[in-house]
């Protein structure tokens, strides 16, 4: 079975209704038996492990021409996978997990990416894929014994490891979609149980994206409604030092997947499809600043 077919079968899990006499349970069982599963890890780390498995299924289907095709940031598919391995390795180093690839020199994302990409250019794409997956799996296994509140530092930012891992989940998801789009393939969305915590991270980042964009949201509150599987509602205090939300000043309603991708730097804020209410300039500022933390 083609790895992309396995992805589509996994996506069927999002629909709990199984028609009578459906062959879907047998198809899913067969697909799981033949695909490489997500690495065993803590429940809170499963969204990341799931995106790694999805990316690996996509990469398994790549042929020689795919690996040399430019995907994003001027990087080929092989260089993109090396970038993911570099950032996963930095997080692994922060929590004491094994670090694969070249010896650790630079400890920032851009520097480590450059080092790992240079190293992987001397190797085959399949070696790059295997080592990226091995790095991700080693991180997952290590996290199985850690509480989600364990402090971790990446690019000078110390937050609970769960938040860093959700950020890794979002980036892996987005870059898998980048690669699938370049190959003209439709990538199924993650299951709702994996989308929701990722969306929660995106909602909690909004005060920081506003601050980085030079906008002061102190004392103001956003009511955010994200629709679709994995969505929900959030009352978001828009000042980084605000401790609790107040009465909502602005309201934004948008698709949950599109919103996550906007935070990840995909899509133009000015053209983002959303319903706005209340303080419209504030709502527009939230959307304009949303991609501020995105990067390669």
Residue ranges and their predicted role:
Residues 1-44, 67-74, 95-108, 121, ...:
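Structured surface interface patches that mediate subunit assembly and partner/cofactor docking
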Residues 4-5, 55-62, 148:
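Active-site-adjacent bridging/hinge elements
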Residues 36-59:
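Long amphipathic N-terminal alpha/beta scaffold segment
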Residues 51, 55, 113-149, 165-168, ...:
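Acidic/histidine-rich alpha-helical segments that form the ligand environment
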Residues 51-53, 57, 65, 72-92, ...:
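Active-site-proximal cofactor/substrate-binding loop regions of enzyme domains
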Residues 56, 88-92, 136-140, 144, ...:
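Structural signal for well-ordered, non-membrane alpha-helices
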């Amino acid at each position: 079975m083609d790895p992309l077919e396995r992805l589509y079968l996994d996506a069927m899990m999002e629909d709990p209704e199984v028609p009578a006499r459906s062959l879907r349970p047998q198809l899913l069982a067969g697909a799981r038996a033949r695909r490489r599963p997500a690495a065993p890890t803590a429940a809170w780390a499963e969204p990341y492990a799931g995106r790694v498995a999805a990316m690996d299924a996509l990469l398994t289907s790549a042929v020689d021409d795919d690996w040399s095709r430019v995907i994003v940031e001027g990087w080929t598919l092989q260089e993109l996978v090396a970038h993911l391995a570099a950032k996963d390795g930095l997080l692994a180093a922060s929590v004491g997990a094994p670090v694969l690839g070249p010896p650790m020199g630079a400890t920032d994302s851009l520097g480590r990416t450059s080092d790992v990409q240079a190293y992987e250019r001397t190797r085959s794409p399949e070696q790059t894929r295997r080592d990226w997956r091995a790095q991700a799996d080693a991180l997952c296994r290590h996290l199985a014994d850690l509480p989600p509140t364990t402090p971790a530092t990446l690019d000078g930012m110390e937050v609970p490891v769960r938040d860093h891992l959700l950020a890794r989940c979002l980036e892996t998801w987005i870059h898998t979609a980048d690669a699938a789009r370049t190959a003209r393939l439709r990538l199924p969305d993650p299951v709702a149980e994996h989308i929701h915590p990722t969306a929660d991270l995106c909602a909690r980042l909004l005060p920081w994206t506003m601050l980085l964009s030079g906008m002061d949201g102190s004392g103001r509150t956003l009511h955010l409604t994200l629709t679709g599987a994995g969505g929900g509602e959030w009352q978001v205090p828009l000042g980084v030092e605000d401790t609790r939300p107040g009465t909502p000043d602005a309201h934004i309603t948008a698709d949950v997947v599109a919103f996550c991708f906007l935070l990840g730097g995909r899509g133009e804020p000015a053209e983002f499809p959303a319903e706005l209410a209340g303080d419209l300039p504030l709502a527009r500022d939230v959307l304009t600043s949303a991609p501020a933390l995105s990067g390669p």
